[in-house]
Amino acid sequence: MSSKATKTVKSKFDIINNQLRDDLIDFRSGDTIRVDVKIKEGDKFRIQSFEGLVIKTQGSGITYSVVVRKMSNGVFVERTFPLHSPIIDSVTLIKRGKVRRSRIYYIRKLSGKAARIKEIMPTKQAKEIK
């Protein structure tokens, strides 16, 4: 009986692992990313970009999601993206930011220059500048 249960569990893991994306880039809180989302309008699909600051990452595996914050027409908008969802077309890293927290909710209270995040330059670019 236990062998049947383990076969069922293994098949569930196989199904989940087949749905995981393998083209995701490595990013964390404080980074600026662009998420391209597929949107269906009628019978057509189009790509909509959402570029902003990562303020939270959570979950693992199929439940991995990220909260991105951007300013749109003077109002800040936060959107949660499940990254292994089929509606996500691509994720692009724009720049790396240096923060000391994994969830940077404090950025919501800051405004102006106080809300800036220090940029980390990749090592290859840093060598080229020097």
UniProtKB/Swiss-Prot annotation:
GO CC list: cytosolic large ribosomal subunit
GO biological process, one term: translation
SUPFAM superfamilies named among the record's database cross-references: Translation proteins SH3-like domain
Keywords: Ribonucleoprotein, Ribosomal protein
Molecular functions (GO terms): structural constituent of ribosome
Gene3D superfamilies: 2.30.30.790
Ribosomal protein is among the record's keywords: yes
Role this protein plays: This protein is located at the 30S-50S ribosomal subunit interface and may play a role in the structure and function of the aminoacyl-tRNA binding site.
PANTHER family per record: LARGE RIBOSOMAL SUBUNIT PROTEIN BL19M, RIBOSOMAL PROTEIN L19
Family of the protein in this entry: Belongs to the bacterial ribosomal protein bL19 family.
UniProt protein name: Large ribosomal subunit protein bL19
Gene: rplS
